[in-house]
Amino acid sequence: MENQPITTDKEILGFITPNIMAITLIALTKTFSVHVGEADGFYFSEVIIVPILMGIMSAWHWRNMELTTRRTWFYNFLNCVIAAMLSGFVLGEGSICILIVSPLILCFVMIGYAIGRALFKKNNTGFNISVVSLLTVVFIADTLSKHEYNNVVADTIVINAPPAKIWKNVVAFKPIKQQPDFWLFRIGLPNPTAATVTGYHEGAGRKCIFSTGYAIGERISTYEPGKNLTFDIIDQPRDPEMMNHLDLLKGQFLLKDNGNGTTTVTGTRWYRLHVFPAWYYDLWAQSIVRNVHIRVMQHIKEISEAK
């Protein structure tokens, strides 16, 4: 059985129908979310309920097949690959965003498949209907619910220069020429390359320019030379990657004179996630925001310490 190709109708339907169902349901969530004023994002229903339903549906089609453990994993992995491709082509999701969500999708597809195998072996129609009905109710309730998760990330660096020399490089800096180290940046996630300003005062406009050409519009809300630069995010492009599911709210750079010719710079970002479960996506969001800080502050350190 291990080396047999996928040939039977039931095998093929186990791939086709779950993915048609998934794309249809997710498209509906996008439609309903717009009507209730939600930003675009991945919700609990999309990354947990839909994959579980996919697994259950596949289990029904494959219920009379004696699949080995390896083939079971392969089939469900293939289902996730098909779903990922459809998400990119039909829903316009970015490749890195799909990469981030894929482990979670595979996990819940496998859980759904295990639930389906148990249900259909028992042939308990009433119980089967109750489980699917419960998942449907949760799906609808989650789709119509508000989804927001706010967090803040702060990072520090010590620069061998006084605040007065560093300040101008904090407010605006020339293009970063060094290639990024962070692996997500290296495979295509937009990374910061430069910052420009329209003036050196409160209320001035500031732009953080990314490698893809996108620019985040900012307005300086606090301008204390050598001490505090705080800015509000006023415009953010809807990039198909992570930026489509994360709103940057505010940024800040605090400079502390250490009294020995060095300065401690603290970079802070406030952001809001529109993807759930938040605990999973925030692990990625924190890492991405932190690496944005590191890339920018390392550049500030390099040009500030240059003689």
Where do the model's predicted regions map?
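A short, structured loop/turn motif at beta-sheet edges
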Residues: 159-164, 221-228, 254-264, 301-307
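Glycine-rich portal/gate segments that line the openings of hydrophobic small-molecule binding cavities
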Residues: 4-14, 26, 30-75, 105-106, ...
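Aromatic-acidic/polar surface patches that form glycan- and anion
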Residues: 159, 209, 289, 293
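A conserved amphipathic terminal alpha-helix motif
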Residues: 102-128, 271-307
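Short capping loops/turns at secondary-structure boundaries
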Residues: 97-104, 148
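Beta-strand/loop substructures that line and gate deep hydrophobic ligand-binding cavities in soluble
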Residues: 69-78, 82-88, 93-100, 238-290, ...
